[in-house]
Regions:
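Bacterial Sec-dependent N-terminal signal peptides
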Residues: 1-6, 11-51
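Chitinase-like catalytic core of GlcNAc-active glycosidases
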Residues: 52-293
Length: 293
């Protein structure tokens, strides 16, 4: 009998801590054990991004600022990235997007530019009601309604009207960027890859467009906001004086194959038109162009 009591107490002693432990394991309230980066870390990160160093750049699409995963949030972009161009979803942003943007700008020191392909006056920012109501507004075509909204003349030999229309469009882009609190504009310039239009088909008109943007963004503006050109910046061959308006040149070079191919795009061309240095070398030094690229 004593043996049975001894066995009973021994089993009770063994089972008690197990029961207590299991009770701890099954607590219904979730605990967050993650400790985020310290303020010292973020301060050092912001200081690094303000320093003179090779810049990390990328495009970011499908931005929502929401979800359990950070795949659609700017907060999920690696901390070391300096500048991000927003590809799509940059208009009518939600509160979640505003919060996401503000955190990355103010805490991480990352800079965000609006980006889209430039072709003609009105691209991307013509009010939707113009496209929806052009017939009821009495226009013969949708394009005629767009041209009327921006003041684009039917007679393109009217250079003053053409210039006024281009500058109106550039200012509307600037207003949009400032409205959302972005850090500048990234011009996606690809006229030799099917993206034709009444601005990009003419280097003088392209200069007018950049000149007006340059009052708001880029090194000539004094605002500290960025003006970037990506795609084919080397192709504005007839207006090299446009080069100093930009903070950065970004050459799109998909599947270049080797370093020599990249060098040609930068220096002496023969791969995708002229090299950057060939285009802008008369107004900028090779060192300056290289550092901006």
């Amino acid at each position: 009998m004593k043996k049975n009591y001894l066995l009973y107490f021994l089993l009770l002693a063994l089972s008690t801590p197990i029961w207590v432990s299991c009770n701890d394991w099954t607590e219904s309230e979730a605990k967050d054990y993650f400790e985020g980066p310290s303020e010292e870390y973020y301060a050092a990160l912001r200081a690094y991004k303000k320093s003179d160093h090779p810049k990390a750049f990328g495009w970011f699409g499908n931005w929502t600022g929401e979800g359990a995963s950070l795949v659609n949030s700017m907060a999920g972009i690696p901390d070391s990235v300096d500048v991000v161009s927003i590809w799509g979803n940059w208009s009518n942003i939600t509160e979640a997007q505003k919060k996401d943007l503000k955190f990355c700008q103010e805490v991480k020191g990352t800079r965000f530019t609006m980006c889209f392909i430039i072709t003609s006056v009105g691209t991307q920012i013509t009010p939707q009601h113009i496209y929806d109501n052009w017939e009821s507004m009495g226009f013969a075509s949708q394009q005629e309604a767009v041209n009327d909204f921006w003041g684009w003349p039917s007679d393109e030999s009217d250079k003053e009207a053409v210039e006024a229309s281009i500058r109106k469009y550039a200012n509307a882009i600037a207003d949009t960027i400032n409205k959302y609190g972005y850090d500048g504009f990234d011009i996606d310039y690809e006229p030799n890859y099917g993206n034709k239009g009444n601005i990009v088909d003419d280097d003088d008109r392209m200069f007018i467009f950049v000149d007006e943007l340059g009052k708001h963004f880029g090194p000539k503006s004094g605002t500290g906001k960025l003006l970037i050109i990506d795609g084919e910046p080397q192709s504005i061959k007839n207006r090299p004086d446009v080069g100093p308006y930009f903070d950065y040149f970004i050459i799109q070079a998909y599947k270049p194959g080797n370093d020599n191919n990249l060098d040609k795009r930068l220096i002496d061309g023969g791969v995708a038109g002229p090299g950057l240095v060939q285009t802008y070398g008369s107004v900028m030094s090779e060192e300056q162009i290289t550092k901006m690229t």
